[in-house]
Amino acid sequence: MDLARQLKNAISSGNLLFGQRQTMSACNSSDARMVIIAANCPTDYIEDLRSRHPDVPMHQVALVNRELGAACGKPFPVSAIAIVDGG
């Protein structure tokens, strides 16, 4: 199963948060089970997120933020996704 299909399944059946601020907030409150990061997400954000939350699994995908947003069915770019409940 490809990433786009998995994301659409998670969106329809689970709880995902989109964007850098919401992802950081979910990690700060220990709600995030996993984080998906776009290929062109700023390096300083990724390093900050990894240093503050080393216990949260993070996966950087090959898709840039516009492609990641489209894969999620969103009309806007998405650079970070926090999976709170995968469904």
Which residues make up each language-model segment?
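Absolute protein N-terminus
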Residues: 1-2, 87
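Charged, alpha-helix-enriched surfaces in structured cytosolic catalytic cores
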Residues: 2, 44, 63-66
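N-terminal first-folded block
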Residues: 2-34
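Surface-exposed beta-strand edges and their flanking turn/coil or helix-capping segments
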Residues: 6, 31-33, 50, 73, ...
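Fold-independent oxyanion-binding glycine-rich loops
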Residues: 20-21, 39-40, 81-86
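N-terminal positively charged helical leader segments and presequences
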Residues: 22-59
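C-terminal structural segments of small proteins and small subunits
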Residues: 55-87
